[in-house]
Amino acid sequence: MRMTGPVERVLTAFLSDPAAPRYGYDLMKAARLPSGTLYPLLARLEQQKLVGSAWETPQQEGERPRKYYRLTGEGVRIARLELAQASARRQRAPARPGRPAPGSLG
Amino acid sequence: MRGERRLLRLGECLVRQACRRLPQEIREEHYREWAAELPAILHDPQVRPAPWRAVRMLVYAADTLRGTALTPGWVRGPRSRLSVAGDLLFWVAALVLVAFNSWSVAQAPGDWQEYLLPAWSVLFVAYLIRKRVHPVGRMTALLYTGSTLTLVAWNAAQGNWLNYVFAALVFIPLPILLLAWWLRVAMPARGRHALRDSG
């Protein structure tokens, strides 16, 4: 799995409560991703067996069943590992020299 | 919300359009999944005011069109003869424009307008290349068509007879191509009724 920004955001959203079922729209809001990015990403995670999906039973008559997603056991393990590695990589990376503040030296 | 059913229908229409591009075996499930989120977006109490929810829902539905091209299993369907002919026509027009505009620059290197036109025609070729690499480009095509028409009309207004020829080349086939595109998008197509029934 290649750790891109969107993947990182989706995994972070899942890990905020790994046991909770997450709908597409719910994940869109949590990860701040548009549907055109989120759904292909979920499909790839599902192909890799990191995410499982199921259809909910509608609570009320006339309501449409929605599909929800959840990290698999393996998905939780890999997501935690990948996010930790990504965080470590960011800490190791040298900080970019920023623009000096007005009035400061350098 | 007023007009809620119409909005939902429009959203469903966009999602259906997106799903038509998916393989048959995953099409129905994706349509059910994506269309089921539309009422949830439209009734989301966290998003206010109501018109903003409607915009979000339509953006969600429209973006699934982009998403289908990135979904695993997506395959470009067989292309119609009209589509192939349209592409060929655009390629010929683009290459002729590049050649003619480059020739014009060579003839009158001092005129700034002559530099603008080759740059624009190279953009035309770049668009066609992009379209080959990435198939999601209908909106870009419409935007580009609009700018093409504007530019051609502006050129024709300058009074150069050659520009009238180019104007005719663009004005005559474009409405036909746009009508064909609209017919393909808006009219019932294979698999659409199955999706409607299942949704």
Model-derived features: positions:
Chain A
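Beta-hairpin "wing" of winged helix-turn-helix
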Residues: 48-62
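N-terminal helix-turn-helix DNA-binding core of bacterial DNA-binding proteins
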Residues: 1-37
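Short alpha-helix boundary/capping motifs
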Residues: 55-57, 73, 97
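Short, hydrophobic-biased segments on the C-terminal half of alpha helices
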Residues: 42-46
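Amphipathic alpha-helical dimerization/coiled-coil segments
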Residues: 77-106
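Basic, amphipathic "hinge/linker" alpha-helix immediately C-terminal to the N-terminal HTH DNA-binding motif
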Residues: 60-83
